[in-house]
Amino acid sequence: MEGGSVNESHSNADQMFDTTIEELCKNLCELQSSNQSPSRQSFGSYGDESKIDSDLQHLALGEMRDIDILEDEGDEDEVAKPEEFDVKSNSSNLDLEVMPRDMEKQTGKKNVTKSNVGVGGMRKKKVGGTKLQNGNEEPSSENVELARFLLNQARNLVSSGDSTHKALELTHRAAKLFEASAENGKPCLEWIMCLHVTAAVHCKLKEYNEAIPVLQRSVEIPVVEEGEEHALAKFAGLMQLGDTYAMVGQLESSISCYTEGLNIQKKVLGENDPRVGETCRYLAEALVQALRFDEAQQVCETALSIHRESGLPGSIAEAADRRLMGLICETKGDHENALEHLVLASMAMAANGQESEVAFVDTSIGDSYLSLSRFDEAICAYQKSLTALKTAKGENHPAVGSVYIRLADLYNRTGKVREAKSYCENALRIYESHNLEISPEEIASGLTDISVICESMNEVEQAITLLQKALKIYADSPGQKIMIAGIEAQMGVLYYMMGKYMESYNTFKSAISKLRATGKKQSTFFGIALNQMGLACIQLDAIEEAVELFEEAKCILEQECGPYHPETLGLYSNLAGAYDAIGRLDDAIKLLGHVVGVREEKLGTANPVTEDEKRRLAQLLKEAGNVTGRKAKSLKTLIDSDLTSSSALR
């Protein structure tokens, strides 16, 4: 996949969670709401490279504004109760309007103001609560007021940095009080939002696994049939839960949450609301991160169709969607369509005053030109982007390093090795500068990209050294199992190329175990990794294990790529060789016969690869007629040598 990024770069995670917690507390406790408050910045936020451009970094939670809560109204015995809760998830754009103002008169509904996700209105109430006939105060009212007070204290502790653990304890106590105050188990919106706050504090403490059950509980409480308020409260919880799953690398669970949230949003706002389009883009980004590109393209097309329906062509939101679509098309090899979308995105951003961000799209445009072998145009696009980024971001910005890497790749492809090495050195200088503005993930991504160029220049040991550094960085980051698995798989190929077959086997084994744990057992990447591990087994004379790996890879690649794809054909050739080695001649002949037939049709009979496999097939047929006279032969003649490179794993 293209090197580069997700979204905006959020380097200070602690500050991010501080503002997230404050925003969630505001949802509960502040009277005023505003539909101008910034939401979590999605792919189209710009400001740095796109989600895909950073080699599928994990979904980061977005920035939220600072707020004040529980303001005194001048009367000690009164507190402002929320007229509406701005139920904004820390993850997605929840700029949802429950009811337009012109509908208020028709429905007779009062106290419904325009907000991002307005989920309910309440009036001021005396702190003492309601008096019962016996003169005692209603306990549930006291519980609610105490819970709000505890949330205020928790917010202050988080803001001051005094004790986040104490803040967590207070939010748990507040949640229990809200739960106890719920009438006859009836869902309480304040309770739901308190759980959202509690989960956000857990995330600030990097206790993601503890946050997940809290958020799961928060999405179980709302009853969608109760109305828009409950539906949108559930939407907020689902999006926050999806983000938390992403932080621990559970992308499939994350996508399920986003999808369910999107369906709720559609039900409330309608299929063609522009805000639904923004959530579509968010889901598409997650699908890209999970390497589910076909689904990501479909969701992104839905977002673009919403822009067409809204009659707002060339908007910033459409530019974001086209940028994402361009990168999806580029990843799928549809370079012409990718170029079209990226050029339109660049024009739209320039028209909307986003000149500083055009540089990032110019980088992607250069990628498309490079893929189309239009090298002169690619150089122009990269140089234009490089000049703009140096001016806007500075000489040592990671985005500048990213363009250096692309230029190094371009010059290496065109045989200008000296220029390629020079640009690699410039990029390394940036990533090894210990610049605090560069996040660890950006450094790891940059080192990984440089290693690919080093490998192509036959500097294999240097490539492994860079990958080891990247691996060490990612090992300390949550939710990076897929990235770590990808690096390990690439290292496995390099070890194989160096003849270090045991090291290759061990790194592939580690990579595959991580891919299984993250649910990536049905991806093309997983199938290719299995095939490569099988090759390492062949070299270690572990033929039976190699057969098992090849057969598993066969099932995956047939489903994901089809029986005529080059990757599948190479796997067939390897499996045929392994079958031959263990005496399963009929199976070997059947597979190799299919490979030869397809190769002749696609490549012609004079192609060297076709000729080699025809000779192998002829030998197998000869041996099948005289099994007792079989001669031992090296396993190296049984495998497809074309698949012993790492290109397929990038």
From Swiss-Prot:
Biased composition (Polar residues): 131-141
Stretches forming TPR repeats: 192-225, 235-268, 277-310, 319-353, 359-392, 401-434, 444-477, 485-518, 527-560, 569-602
Name of protein: Protein KINESIN LIGHT CHAIN-RELATED 3
Homology family: Belongs to the kinesin light chain family.
Region of interest called Disordered, as start-end residue ranges on this chain: 104-141
SUPFAM superfamilies attached to this UniProt entry: TPR-like
Repeat listed as a keyword: yes
Entries under InterPro entries matching the protein: TPR-like_helical_dom_sf (IPR011990), TPR_rpt (IPR019734)
Alphabetical list of Pfam families matching this protein: TPR_12 (PF13424)
Species, as recorded: Arabidopsis thaliana (Mouse-ear cress)
Keyword set, alphabetical order: Repeat, TPR repeat
